[in-house]
């Protein structure tokens, strides 16, 4: 496979990837009506303001122009950083389950069924970086306004992870929330947020859990 990091990538070069339920080369399907559970988490969107530049917001008129251009070098670099983050054995490939975590790092929340359908398009159940760019490039162009930069998220994660052990403890997150939001959140609200974030109940927030939190 070629090194996409060296050559500007054209969205029209290959179009074999598609989101399940979407036209070929189209954007992610629009979500259905919000459930009661989803409405209950809407209040946590205030957490998105904690990282400031982590979210890139563009006016719709500007975002519309993103579809008909090449990926910029810094965008390919962002995809490469995300890919390498989950290519843990450094063999140049990631499996479809790792692909799901990698996509979440970039701000996408694929369902298990979507990942299974995507995996059926993958030869050998793995993707290399060129395949990854083919899959994520159109999404990056189509939804620039919703993207979350992995580098900015990493920087924000390190701000929370004050002892540098790779995980955010309940105490670290509580202290950060209090410092950043002050009295805007009660102790009960902080505890509810922590309970919602700590998906595996180990008392620690790892990077993937942090990404899920910031993507709300």
UniProtKB/Swiss-Prot annotation:
Ca(2+) 2 binds at residues 161, 163, 165, 167, 172. Expressed in the inner hair cells (IHCs), outer hair cells,(OHCs) and vestibular hair cells within the ear and in the retina (at protein level). Expressed in the retinal cone type 6 ON-bipolar cells and type 1 OFF-bipolar cells (at protein level). Expressed in the organ of Corti and spiral ganglion neurons in the cochlea (at protein level). Residues 1-41 are annotated as: Disordered. Keywords: Calcium, Cell membrane, Cytoplasm, Golgi apparatus, Hearing, Lipoprotein, Membrane, Metal-binding, Myristate, Repeat, Sensory transduction, Vision. Residues 20-29 have a biased composition (Low complexity). SMART domains: EFh. GO terms for molecular function: calcium channel regulator activity; calcium ion binding. Disruption phenotype: Mice exhibit synaptic hearing impairment and impaired auditory brainstem responses. Enhanced inactivation of Ca(2+) influx in inner hair cells (IHCs), whereas its amplitude and voltage dependence of activation is normal. Reduced normal spontaneous and sound-evoked firing of spiral ganglion neurons (SGNs) seen. Mice exhibit normal retinal morphology but altered light responses of retinal ganglion cells. It holds the Pfam family EF-hand_7. SUPFAM superfamilies: EF-hand (SSF47473). It is found in: Cytoplasm, Perinuclear region; Cell membrane; Golgi apparatus. GO terms for biological process: sensory perception of sound; visual perception. A lipid is attached at residue 2 (N-myristoyl glycine). The keyword Isomerase does not apply. One of its GO terms (cellular component) is perinuclear region of cytoplasm. Residues 74-109, 125-142, 148-183, 185-216 form the EF-hand domain. InterPro entries: CaBP1/2/4/5 (IPR043582), EF-hand-dom_pair (IPR011992), EF_Hand_1_Ca_BS (IPR018247), EF_hand_dom (IPR002048). Coiled coil: none annotated. Ca(2+) 3 binds at residues 198, 200, 202, 209. Ca(2+) 1 binds at residues 87, 89, 91, 93, 98. It is a lipid-anchor. Required for sound encoding at inner hair cells (IHCs) synapses, likely via inhibition of the inactivation of voltage-gated calcium channel of type 1.3 (Cav1.3) in the IHCs. Required for the normal transfer of light signals through the retina. This is Calcium-binding protein 2. The gene is Cabp2.
């Amino acid at each position: 496979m070629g090194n996409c990091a060296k050559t500007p990538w054209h969205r029209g070069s290959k179009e074999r990837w598609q989101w399940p339920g979407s036209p070929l080369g189209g954007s992610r399907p629009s979500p259905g009506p919000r459930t009661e559970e989803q409405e209950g988490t809407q209040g946590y969107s205030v957490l998105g303001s904690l990282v400031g530049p982590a979210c890139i917001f563009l006016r719709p008129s500007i975002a519309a122009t993103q579809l008909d251009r090449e990926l910029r070098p810094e965008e390919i670099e962002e995809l490469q950083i995300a890919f390498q983050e989950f290519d843990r054995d450094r063999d140049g490939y990631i499996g479809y389950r790792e692909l799901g975590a990698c996509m979440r790092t970039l701000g996408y929340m694929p369902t298990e069924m979507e990942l299974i359908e995507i995996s059926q398009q993958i030869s050998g159940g793995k993707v290399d970086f060129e395949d990854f760019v083919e899959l994520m490039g159109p999404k990056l162009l189509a939804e620039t306004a919703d993207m979350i930069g992995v580098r900015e998220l990493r920087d924000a994660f390190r701000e929370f992870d004050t002892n540098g052990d790779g995980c955010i403890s309940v105490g670290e997150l509580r202290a950060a929330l209090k410092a950043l939001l002050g009295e805007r959140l009660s102790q009960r609200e902080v505890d509810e947020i922590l309970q919602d974030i700590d998906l595996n109940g180990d008392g620690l927030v790892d990077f993937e859990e942090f990404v899920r939190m910031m993507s709300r």
